[in-house]
Amino acid sequence: AVEKVNSSSSLAEVIDRILDKGIVIDAWVRVSLVGIELLSVEARXVIA
């Protein structure tokens, strides 16, 4: 199962999810050229 983790989650909640369900994936990618943001990708998932 894949579950979205809200950015408002506290560190304790995230650790609890890791211990309870499995792996938390938090990825953030940002591509910019000369100060102009071209691409922004943000993904957070919990894999049980």
From Swiss-Prot:
Annotated InterPro entries: Gas-vesicle_GvpA-like, GvpA, GvpA-like_CS
UniProt main location, coarse: other
Cellular compartment(s): Gas vesicle shell
GO CC terms of this entry: gas vesicle; vesicle membrane
PROSITE patterns reported for this sequence: GAS_VESICLE_A_1 (PS00234)
Keywords for this protein: Gas vesicle
Molecular function as annotated in GO: structural molecule activity
Cell division as UniProt keyword: no
Pfam hit, one: Gas_vesicle
Family: Belongs to the gas vesicle GvpA family.
Function field: Gas vesicles are hollow, gas filled proteinaceous nanostructures found in some microorganisms. During planktonic growth they allow positioning of the organism at a favorable depth for light or nutrient acquisition. GvpA forms the protein shell.
Subunit structure: The gas vesicle shell is 2 nm thick and consists of a single layer of this protein. It forms helical ribs nearly perpendicular to the long axis of the vesicle.
Protein name listed in UniProt: Gas vesicle protein A
Source organism of this protein record: Spirulina sp. (strain CCAP 1475/10)
Gene this chain is encoded by: gvpA
